[in-house]
Design a protein with these regions (language model features):
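Conserved NTP-donor binding/palm subdomain of two-metal-ion nucleotidyltransferases/polymerases, i.e.
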Residues: 106-109, 120-131, 140-141, 145
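Noncatalytic, basic helical substrate-engagement surface that gates or grips nucleic-acid strands
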Residues: 1-93, 112-114, 120
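Residue-level marker for buried hydrophobic side chains located in beta-strands
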Residues: 99-100
């Protein structure tokens, strides 16, 4: 459909994300324990579910993914910290059309356009259940959202902090979406909200979170180039190293090469047309 993907990899998580990382680690550890219990009971369905929940992304997996992308001729950027922040910068700079993510943090980091529910199957697995629901791609324009809400990006960040972000997962006690929006509309910023609403939370810590969203670590040193796929290297990685089905990989490679050549051909035709006009 003419989509040219650019992948962004997470770097080192910021210190202010420690609480969220600890929470996720505990979830994986609990799932791993329940997996072992399910295996002992012979409950294979539950074991499969808990195995998925306990899975961890390793450095080796990330490096393998990068090698495969290089072989496929697809560009990627290694973020120094949060991938969402790096992607938002790339979009804001005009080097990409939109961030594709399920995470609304993309908007807080300043991505001018966010696409959610971008899937091949058009379905999404429901958390903790063997059920799926149909989903349709959703596009959110940051400026349209801000205009509709009547707030600035900084105020959107403050609103999110009140509800809870990856850097303060629990948010402020007894404050939901509606109350958070009302507080921001009335008081304009975190600093001006009466302390009675903040339930003892340190305003300095909350402001630190806001500042991270506004000025996250990013790199400006990246290149975005699409190259012709190296079919032999793709097969070596997938078939020889990871035991993928050779026929399926060959078929996928044919489709990939065809897509690249059609893209390259249209690009060349566009240049030729431009030169003829000028």
């Amino acid at each position: 459909n003419g989509i040219k993907p650019l992948y962004v990899f997470d770097g080192k998580p910021p210190e202010i994300k420690a609480e969220e990382i600890a929470r996720r680690k505990k979830i994986r550890e609990d799932a791993s324990r329940k997996y072992e219990e399910s295996i002992k009971k012979g409950d294979l369905e539950s074991a499969r579910r808990y195995a998925m929940m306990s899975a961890k992304l390793t450095d080796e997996m990330v490096n393998d993914a990068k090698k495969l992308l290089e072989a496929m001729g697809l560009p990627y950027v290694q973020a120094p910290a949060e991938g969402e922040a790096q992607a938002a910068y790339i979009v804001r700079k005009g080097d990409a059309y939109a961030s594709a993510s399920q995470d609304y943090d993309s908007l807080l980091f300043g991505s001018t356009r966010l696409i959610r529910n971008l899937t091949i199957s058009g379905r999404r697995k429901l958390p903790g259940r063997e059920e799926y629901e149909e989903v349709k791609p959703e596009i959110i324009e940051l400026n349209l959202l801000l205009n509709k809400l009547g707030i600035t990006r900084e105020q959107l960040i403050d609103l999110a902090i009140l509800i809870g972000t990856d850097y303060n997962p629990d948010g402020i006690p007894n404050i939901g979406v509606k109350t958070a929006y009302q507080l921001i509309k009335q008081y304009k910023s975190l600093e001006k909200i009466p302390k009675t609403y903040l339930a003892g939370e340190s305003i300095d810590e909350l402001i630190k979170i806001r500042q991270y969203f506004l000025t996250p670590p990013i790199t400006v040193n990246y290149r975005i180039d699409w190259r012709e796929p190296d079919v032999n290297e793709i097969k070596r990685i997938l078939v020889e190293e990871h035991d993928f089905n050779s026929e399926r990989v060959s078929n996928a490679c044919e489709r990939l090469v065809k897509a690249y050549r059609e893209f390259f051909k249209s690009k060349q035709m566009g240049l030729e047309t431009w030169f003829k006009k000028n």
